[in-house]
Amino acid sequence: MTLDLSKPATAGYLSGFANEFATEALPGALPHGRNSPQRAPYGLYAEQLSGTAFTAPRGHNRRSWLYRIRPAAVHRPFEPYAGAQRLVSEFGDSADVPPTPPNQLRWDPLPMLVEPTDFVDGLVTMAGNGSAAAMNGCAIHLYAANRSMQDRFFYSADGELLIVPQQGRLFIATEFGRLDVEPFEIAVIPRGVRFAVALPDGDARGYICENFGALLRLPDLGPIGSNGLANPRDFLTPQAAYEDREGAFELIAKLNGRLWRADIGHSPLDVVAWHGNYAPYKYDLRLFNTIGSISFDHPDPSIFLVLQAQSDTPGVDTIDFVIFPPRWLAAEDTFRPPWFHRNVASEFMGLVHGAYDAKAEGFVPGGASLHNCMSGHGPDADTFEKASASDTTKPHKVDATMAFMFETRTLIRPTCYALDTAQLQADYFECWQGIKKHFNPEQK
């Protein structure tokens, strides 16, 4: 199977989360019974890609063996890349990261572009925490692009990329094979994996959480049982596919927050076969098995957890990826929208489609909001009044929506770009100013 981004993929996918996969684009390309034979089949080179330490416990160890036409070391020296100057990966006080205000923040979507711009040059960092160099925390980027990557390839050595398309499909060709991803789906590209992005629909826009720390995993289900939330079988990994092209290509690397470029005389997407458990994958958010109350109260939003990156503190994650999909609300005598809240964690939200049930106006697809540690947030005035008077004896379906949240245990620090951009809604605080005083000590 060879790569061709000019049309939709025809190959199927490998099902499962972090499975030990084995796949080959040519029969017999995978060595039998060993990883690095003296001579690999078809004159290929054996190369291991390690996503965790060699000595990580077996249940957490991630690596894959690639059998490729040329090793990844074959390229010219890197030099600084002049494009994509809006990326940040260190979130201490700096010229890129000003003091973090406690204000609630909300943004309109990035405008679609006029100048031809590909996925790499369309990246901008909105916020983040921690440090790429120290391998902890994350960066939250937006992307807006209108041109496919042409004879150039990209990888991040800083972290794995959780990509959430909002507008436009992405045809992602990786070293491991191809992922076709549309809005309502997500893709995860592991640290170090080289890839190119084609835009079959022209304009494309979306969100990225770049995870600097421990790899994303499925959460434990506890008393939910053995099934529910995001089921492992619904995660899809590409089958091996390759291209054998020579010419003048460009390889873009992201390391310690900086972009670097190198000339390369061939396509690096030349892996003919691979096996292992460190590989790209995608997931359709519409397959999420939503859990909720069928008696009273609105449970904590942890019931909407899709993926997590664990910390060294049990029960506390460095990153939670949470979605708010279509669902039935049936709790009686209950305020059904998300309640008013102050959180020790920090919450960055985005909207893929429709409307969010806690905000009647202002939060639109492609937009974003940030509620940092202990910043009060919750439904706007109009939503509160309507939900307080609604008939809760009848179930109600929240439909035609897909919101999500990147939640982190440490402060999410907005960049100078995020605080200075014209997309920042200066009047966001007004959505709560109309909340009425209902208190009456004489009436219970």
From Swiss-Prot:
Positions of Fe cation binding: 341, 347, 377
A GO cellular component term found in this entry reads: cytoplasm
Look up and give the organism this protein is from.
Burkholderia orbicola (strain MC0-3)
Q: Name one GO molecular function term.
A: iron ion binding
Q: What is the protein name given in its UniProt record? A: Homogentisate 1,2-dioxygenase
InterPro entries referenced in this protein's UniProt entry, alphabetically: HgmA_C, HgmA_N, Homogentis_dOase, Homogentis_dOase_bac, RmlC-like_jellyroll, RmlC_Cupin_sf
Q: How does it assemble?
A: Hexamer; dimer of trimers.
Per UniProt, homogentisate binds at 356, 377
Print the keywords alphabetically. Answer: Dioxygenase, Iron, Metal-binding, Oxidoreductase, Phenylalanine catabolism, Tyrosine catabolism
SUPFAM superfamilies given in the database record:
RmlC-like cupins
**Active site per database record:** 298 (proton acceptor)
